[in-house]
Amino acid sequence: MPRKGLRPRDRRALPEADYKYDSVLVARFVNKINFEGKKATAEKIVADSMVIIADKTKEDAMTVFNRCIETVRPLLELKARRVGGATYQVPVEVKPLRSTSLAMCWLLDAARSRKGRPMAEKLAEEIILGSKKEGAAFKKREDTHRMAEANRAFAHFKW
């Protein structure tokens, strides 16, 4: 039996703006990189990669980072819906907070999959490529959109 009205949603607080770059986006990115509670290491990786980005592109690192997140953010994603014994991949729109989180995860996965260099260099390279609409993270976005387009026939199953 459904409840009357909607239940209040769990609202997780966003982190405070990063002290160095004064950006909530960077603070969230540091938290995504954070591994085994070593936040200082995560902050150092982000700071070093921002320096590398500024050196390589001759642009403001925050501008490149923001452009990268915007280009890698997905607009659609696939959700599995079970209807009558069959499972369909249904394309649904992605909420803004989730789309930025997905973009950050894809950037990190792409950087981690590169081998042989320090994490700051790999991350900087992936951010630069993402801002130019290239690289593995952008490819992941394009693949997701392509799959959503292919499964457009099942869009009427979203509820």
UniProtKB/Swiss-Prot annotation:
The keyword Manganese does not apply. Part of the 30S ribosomal subunit. Contacts proteins S9 and S11. InterPro entries: Ribosomal_uS7, Ribosomal_uS7_bac/org-type, Ribosomal_uS7_CS, Ribosomal_uS7_dom, Ribosomal_uS7_dom_sf. One of its GO terms (cellular component) is small ribosomal subunit. It comes from the Bacteria. Keywords: Ribonucleoprotein, Ribosomal protein, RNA-binding, rRNA-binding, tRNA-binding. This is Small ribosomal subunit protein uS7. Belongs to the universal ribosomal protein uS7 family. One of its GO terms (molecular function) is structural constituent of ribosome. The keyword Ribosomal protein applies. One of the primary rRNA binding proteins, it binds directly to 16S rRNA where it nucleates assembly of the head domain of the 30S subunit. Is located at the subunit interface close to the decoding center, probably blocks exit of the E-site tRNA. One of its GO terms (biological process) is translation.
